[in-house]
Amino acid sequence: MKIGILALQGAVREHCRIVHKLGHKTVDILYPRDLIGIDGLILPGGESTTISKLLVRYGLLTPIVELGHKKLPIFGTCSGLILLSKNIAKSEQYRLGLMDTYVKRNAFGRQLASFETKMPIPILGNIPYPTIFIRAPYIDKADKGVNILLSHESRILFAEQDNFLAASFHPELTEDVRVHEYFIQKILSYQKFCNL
């Protein structure tokens, strides 16, 4: 399996490390040609406005949207969650707009307000998951087609819709591989669907 990792900014190496640990290959996505032959795509955290402009500059925005409509599994963390959303509060930035969600940016404040805590995520099993939030966004509202995997104080922090997965936290900064394993299961389901 080959998983593309958007390499314009953010924790690219950290995502690569976990995907490799799980026994799969990665490819850095910098240009549209890099998208050829990938089985899934990860959008790492970073600064969402900058990343959105770079997606346009490097000609990646439209090809990624097209792949999303073709059901390619896409996983966004932190700013990746923002990019996947159709609606971003107080922002006109470019976005992929693939998930029926309404997002608030920098919801947990500045760098100093960032934090780490263990939270139960039932879909990942009984052991609480170490969530790391860095100037994290959250999903304020979600349409019916969105499955909420984790919420806290009415803020949606982890969700999926069809082939898309979005987390407001940074699973790539932990040693716990369960979120990435869950995404890989999405890819395997997609591959089975394609082979029907």
UniProtKB/Swiss-Prot annotation:
<feature type="binding site">
    <location>
        <begin position="46"/>
        <end position="48"/>
    </location>
    <ligand>
        <name>L-glutamine</name>
    </ligand>
</feature>
<comment type="similarity">
    <text>Belongs to the glutaminase PdxT/SNO family.</text>
</comment>
<feature type="active site" description="Charge relay system">
    <location>
        <position position="170"/>
    </location>
</feature>
<dbReference type="GO" id="GO:0005829">
    <property type="term" value="C:cytosol"/>
</dbReference>
<dbReference type="GO" id="GO:0042823">
    <property type="term" value="P:pyridoxal phosphate biosynthetic process"/>
</dbReference>
<comment type="pathway">
    <text>Cofactor biosynthesis; pyridoxal 5'-phosphate biosynthesis.</text>
</comment>
<feature type="binding site">
    <location>
        <begin position="134"/>
        <end position="135"/>
    </location>
    <ligand>
        <name>L-glutamine</name>
    </ligand>
</feature>
<keyword id="KW-0456">Lyase</keyword>
<dbReference type="GO" id="GO:0006543">
    <property type="term" value="P:glutamine catabolic process"/>
</dbReference>
<protein>
    <recommendedName>
        <fullName>Pyridoxal 5'-phosphate synthase subunit PdxT</fullName>
        <ecNumber>4.3.3.6</ecNumber>
        <ecNumber>3.5.1.2</ecNumber>
    </recommendedName>
</protein>
<dbReference type="GO" id="GO:0036381">
    <property type="term" value="F:pyridoxal 5'-phosphate synthase (glutamine hydrolysing) activity"/>
</dbReference>
<dbReference type="InterPro" id="IPR029062">
    <property type="entry name" value="Class_I_gatase-like"/>
</dbReference>
<comment type="subunit">
    <text>In the presence of PdxS, forms a dodecamer of heterodimers. Only shows activity in the heterodimer.</text>
</comment>
<keyword id="KW-0315">Glutamine amidotransferase</keyword>
<dbReference type="GO" id="GO:1903600">
    <property type="term" value="C:glutaminase complex"/>
</dbReference>
<feature type="binding site">
    <location>
        <position position="105"/>
    </location>
    <ligand>
        <name>L-glutamine</name>
    </ligand>
</feature>
<dbReference type="GO" id="GO:0004359">
    <property type="term" value="F:glutaminase activity"/>
</dbReference>
<dbReference type="Pfam" id="PF01174">
    <property type="entry name" value="SNO"/>
</dbReference>
<dbReference type="InterPro" id="IPR021196">
    <property type="entry name" value="PdxT/SNO_CS"/>
</dbReference>
<keyword id="KW-0378">Hydrolase</keyword>
<dbReference type="InterPro" id="IPR002161">
    <property type="entry name" value="PdxT/SNO"/>
</dbReference>
<dbReference type="GO" id="GO:0008614">
    <property type="term" value="P:pyridoxine metabolic process"/>
</dbReference>
<feature type="active site" description="Nucleophile">
    <location>
        <position position="78"/>
    </location>
</feature>
<feature type="active site" description="Charge relay system">
    <location>
        <position position="172"/>
    </location>
</feature>
<comment type="function">
    <text>Catalyzes the hydrolysis of glutamine to glutamate and ammonia as part of the biosynthesis of pyridoxal 5'-phosphate. The resulting ammonia molecule is channeled to the active site of PdxS.</text>
</comment>
<keyword id="KW-0663">Pyridoxal phosphate</keyword>
